[in-house]
């Protein structure tokens, strides 16, 4: 019995440990700064000032167009969601059966207890009702800014950007990560773009330390909030 309890406790601990998301770690290679690509040497040097791959319109502003350039993304994210459901189900049924003969013969209805005659009549009735009501609401807001680098330039001119910012505070670290696609036309003259203009955006705001741990429920509370809890 003791062995069974130990195995059950270890299994439950392993399952609960698997439900805990790993804390973010710095220096993720995917979000590492992308350095500018070294241009290939030209086959012949004609002495011209113009170099292929570094052309720019004389009437346009200087914007980030090449791999390794820096872009500042202004975070302005607000989401509000609400959902409600209301359902009700009622079912009532009844039936009665009366028999005067059984296989053509009239049965003896004398009650041996002497408390009225017996009968073959039968009846039933049922009533069932179910009612449910649920509501959910969620609101999120994220403002700030993060400076990232151009990771790639697609053939159609769309710019792929990504980067991260770590801020070390007294009681832990704060992390902001973003990755997505930006149109060159949406970049302002000061190389800034709003996060609402970032397509396929992947924005992460997280942290480590005592403040982040205080917002997480304990392992015992997670058991009652997990699908393993049968009630």
UniProtKB/Swiss-Prot annotation:
Q: Where is the lipid attached (N-palmitoyl cysteine)?
A: 19
Q: Where in the cell is it found?
A: Cell outer membrane; Bacterial flagellum basal body
Q: Which residues form a coiled coil?
A: none
Covalent lipid sites (S-diacylglycerol cysteine) = 19
Membrane-related topology note = Lipid-anchor
- The keyword Zinc appears for this protein: no
UniProt GO BP = bacterial-type flagellum-dependent cell motility
Q: Which PROSITE patterns match?
A: PROKAR_LIPOPROTEIN
**Record's keyword terms, sorted:** Bacterial flagellum, Cell outer membrane, Lipoprotein, Membrane, Palmitate, Signal
Name the source's superkingdom: Bacteria
The residues the entry assigns to the signal sequence are 1-18
Q: Which GO terms describe its molecular function?
A: cytoskeletal motor activity
State how it assembles: The basal body constitutes a major portion of the flagellar organelle and consists of four rings (L,P,S, and M) mounted on a central rod.
Q: Which family does it belong to?
A: Belongs to the FlgH family.
Quote the function comment for this protein. Assembles around the rod to form the L-ring and probably protects the motor/basal body from shearing forces during rotation.
Q: What is this protein called?
A: Flagellar L-ring protein
Q: What organism does this protein naturally occur in? A: Pseudomonas fluorescens (strain ATCC BAA-477 / NRRL B-23932 / Pf-5)
């Amino acid at each position: 019995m003791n062995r069974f309890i130990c195995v059950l406790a270890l299994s439950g601990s392993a399952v609960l440990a698997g439900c805990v998301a790993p804390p973010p770690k710095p220096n993720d290679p995917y979000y590492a700064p992308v350095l500018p690509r070294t241009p290939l040497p030209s086959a012949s040097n004609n002495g011209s000032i113009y170099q292929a791959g570094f052309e720019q319109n004389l009437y346009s502003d200087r914007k980030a167009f090449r791999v390794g350039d820096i872009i500042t993304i202004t975070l302005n994210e607000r989401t509000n969601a609400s959902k409600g459901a209301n359902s009700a189900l009622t079912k009532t049924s009844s039936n009665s059966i009366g028999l005067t003969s059984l296989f053509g013969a009239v049965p003896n209805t004398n009650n041996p207890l002497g408390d009225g005659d017996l009968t073959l009549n039968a009846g039933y009735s049922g009533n069932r009702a179910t009612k449910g009501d649920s509501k959910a609401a969620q609101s999120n807001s994220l403002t700030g800014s993060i400076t990232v680098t151009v990771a790639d330039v697609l053939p159609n001119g769309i710019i792929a950007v990504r980067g991260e910012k770590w801020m070390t505070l007294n009681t832990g670290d704060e992390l902001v990560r973003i990755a997505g696609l930006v149109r060159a036309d949406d970049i302002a003259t000061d190389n800034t773009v709003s996060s609402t203009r970032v397509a396929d955006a992947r924005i992460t705001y997280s942290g480590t330390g005592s403040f982040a741990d205080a917002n997480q429920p304990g392992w015992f509370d997670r058991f009652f909030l997990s699908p393993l809890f049968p009630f």
